[in-house]
Design a protein with these regions (language model features):
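Primarily the internal scaffold of c-type cytochrome electron-transfer domains
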Residues: 1-179
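Extended alpha-helical scaffolding segments
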Residues: 181-183
Length: 183
């Protein structure tokens, strides 16, 4: 669990969210935070791995709380589960019943990609009584468009996994694009 793994279909979804037990460093390498130079110890105590502070205060070390820790951003009641940055941007998966891990790619929730690509999204992790189409419509209503994230490679990975002829050139484009996460 502490060795990096390649983004293979057995371990990661096509959008590179964690699918199986992997070292979270792999998802971290995909994040905009990593690209900006943020390190593990900016959020975690290097000796205990515990968060340096609690709740949204971790994210507010860099992000403007008046803009992001607000109902106008997260669309949830203040203090509720959906109002926690990590619930939307670092969804948790529990492995073997006792090992909860958050995906550290810190992605923008993309329920539209759940609809088109079949990947999970943070909205439906909590709103289990609704489907991805509902979540995608809710995000579209809030933003006036589909959400856009830092990780844009999912449709290309899906095409590659599906054996589409255009996938090779598109994969080469991702591999040569310095703006893409290096992993």
């Amino acid at each position: 669990h502490y060795l990096p793994s390649l983004l293979t279909p057995a371990l990661y979804h096509v959008d590179a969210q964690q699918q199986d037990e992997v070292f979270i460093w792999g998802s971290w390498l995909q994040s905009r935070m990593h690209a900006a130079g943020v390190t593990c110890s900016d959020c975690h105590d290097p000796h205990t791995q515990k968060l340096r502070t609690s709740g949204n205060a971790v994210c507010a070390q860099c992000h403007d709380a008046s803009k992001y820790d607000a109902g106008t951003h997260h669309r949830h009641q203040q203090g509720a589960a959906g109002a926690q940055c990590a619930d939307c941007h670092m969804p948790r998966t529990t492995y073997m019943v006792v090992d909860p891990r958050r995906d550290h790619s810190m992605r923008v929730p993309r329920p539209d990609e759940s609809v088109s690509l079949g990947v999970p999204n943070a909205c439906n992790a909590c709103h289990t009584d609704r489907d991805a189409k509902w979540a995608a419509a809710a995000v579209r209503d809030w933003l006036g468009r589909d959400a856009v994230g830092y990780q844009t490679f999912a449709p290309v990975f899906q095409a590659a996994e599906g054996g589409e002829p255009s996938a090779l050139d598109r994969l080469a484009g991702i591999a040569s694009d310095a703006a893409q996460p290096a992993i």
